[in-house]
Every structure is written in structure tokens, then in C-alpha cells.
């Protein structure tokens, strides 16, 4: 899971190039302010926070050394501010996805983890569920008392490889907010976790020179020439090719939206060569026919 040359394309370069934020024993006022900003950014999913919404009492306790970073994280995650942003308006499975992302820096590994937190929330309430993340061995081993939680894109002992791919269904770029995504309150991983499958990584739109393609949520790609009765091409297979950044003579230099074409299998190689000659980039190739 190490991030190398693909970091900028995946939108994780800022995290790859920075160190975890820690409040050391001899911290200054500026150090405390930096930690407070980092906690708000992480736990509130990079959502904008007004000055009147800040938890001034908890901030003072942290600045005075009365509470640790872990307890400040706990206070923010249990606050009415957090509930208004992520609990009240979301399905519970989406809330669990966000709790994993905000507090443990990863995506859920399996449906069992989601079921565990669903049961805990139903039987003991939201605060107890938040405690289960922050009091976990996983949290303590990775962040301890004074490190601000961060997105864990690198492999660690006990991690599962599915976590890397699924994290990019939750993380949509450094400047993205968890409350400003197109899919809004719907769960990102419920289908994958229920079917025990993993989808391909689709990078943030800003790093792909346009919106990257995502297949239908229903998963019902039409068969045989996009639903027709007559197969198109010998193999009866069609592919949707999404193209971006064509820069050949005659094309305007202003930024353009992506272009998608439907190509039969036997013409796919020829089409890719033509795109390359025009200076374009292939954003995605996905089946448009199931037969």
C-alpha cells in the first residue's frame, strides 16, 4: 500500500509528504493551535467550521494541558456539532463509514465491523459507539494519547489490502469535504461489504483532468449493443472508452469535459491508437455489453 508516483493522481500527496501532527510535552500555544486545527479538519471531515461552532471549552482544556489530544478528539466526535454534520442526516451505515475514516483513518474491512457498530449503537447509543473506536487497541497503537488521527494510506501490521481500495470510496481528495460529495448521505461501501467485493480505485476528479467514470449504482449494464436485440460486432461486446485531454491541432486549448465513445471489441485497439495520436488520455475503459 505504499504511495509512490501515483500519490498525486490519487490525491494523497499532501499526506504522503507530511508527518503526523503530535502535541509534545513541552508544547507552545502555537503548537496547541496547530493540533486543534488538525483535529477539526480530521474529525469533521474537512468541513467548514464557523468560529461560533468551535468547542472553546475543550480547546482551552487542551491548551492548558488538562486533557490529551485523544480526549479532545473524543469531545469533538461526541459533540452536537459532529452529530449535526454526520449523524442526524445520514444513514447509519454511512455514519459508521465516516466514524472509521475520521477516528481510525481507514475504511471498514468487512461487514462484520459494520454489524458490530450497528448493534452497539442500537443497544448502547452513539456515545458508547464513539468510545469503542477511541478506546480500541487499534487507536492506541496508531495514535496514542497525543497524535491527531490521520488517514492511514500505508500498509501496517494487521491491515487488509481491501482497506486501501475502499478508502478511496470515502476519501475524494485533499480539498474535498465529507459533506460536499455527489453521493451525499448514501453509503459508499454497503454493497461492497455485503457482497465481499472490491471495486476499482477511481481517483479524485481534480487529479484526472475531469470527472472520472463510475458505473451505474444498480450495476445493470445493458447487454448486446446497449440493450438492442442485434449484437454489434463479431464478439458482441462493446466497451465505453472515456477520453480526456485531447490536444491535437484544431482542438481548443481551454479545459474541456471528458468525451465517451462506445467501441466494439474488434475496434478497441485501433481506437486507443487514434486517441494516443491525438494526444489524449484514456480515463477509463469499461464494459458496455455483458454478452
From Swiss-Prot:
Keyword Protein transport: yes or no?
no
InterPro entries linked to this entry: CpcD-like_dom, PBS_linker_dom, PBS_linker_sf, Phycobilisome
Q: Name one GO cellular component term.
A: phycobilisome
Q: Which residues cross the membrane?
A: none
The membrane-topology field of this record reads: Peripheral membrane protein
Instruction: Give the highest taxon in the source lineage.
Output: Bacteria
Q: Residues in domain CpcD-like? A: 236-288
Q: Does the keyword Thylakoid apply?
A: yes
Q: State its location(s).
A: Cellular thylakoid membrane
The record's Gene3D superfamilies line, in alphabetical order, gives: Phycobilisome linker domain
Domain (PBS-linker): give its ranges: 2-179
One GO BP: photosynthesis
Instruction: Give the record's keywords alphabetically.
Output: Antenna complex, Membrane, Photosynthesis, Phycobilisome, Thylakoid
Its biological function? Rod linker protein, connecting hexameric phycocyanin (PC, made by cpcA and cpcB) rods in the phycobilisome (PBS). PC is the major phycobiliprotein in PBS rods. Linker polypeptides determine the state of aggregation and the location of the disk-shaped phycobiliprotein units within the phycobilisome and modulate their spectroscopic properties in order to mediate a directed and optimal energy transfer.
The family line of this record is: Belongs to the phycobilisome linker protein family.
PANTHER family (alphabetical): PHYCOBILIPROTEIN APCE, PHYCOBILISOME 32.1 KDA LINKER POLYPEPTIDE, PHYCOCYANIN-ASSOCIATED, ROD 2-RELATED
The subunit structure is: Part of 2 PBS rod complexes, the conventional CpcG-PBS rod and a photosystem I-specific CpcL-PBS rod, both of which include ferredoxin--NADP reductase (petH). CpcG-PBS has on average 3 stacked phycocyanin hexamers (PC, CpcA and CpcB). Linker CpcG connects the PC stack to the thylakoid, the hexamers are linked by 1 copy of CpcC1, 1 copy of CpcC2 and the stack is terminated by a single copy of CpcD. The CpcL-PBS has on average 5 stacked phycocyanin hexamers (PC, CpcA and CpcB).
Name-wise, this protein is Phycobilisome 32.1 kDa linker polypeptide, phycocyanin-associated, rod 1
Organism listed in the record: Synechocystis sp. (strain ATCC 27184 / PCC 6803 / Kazusa)
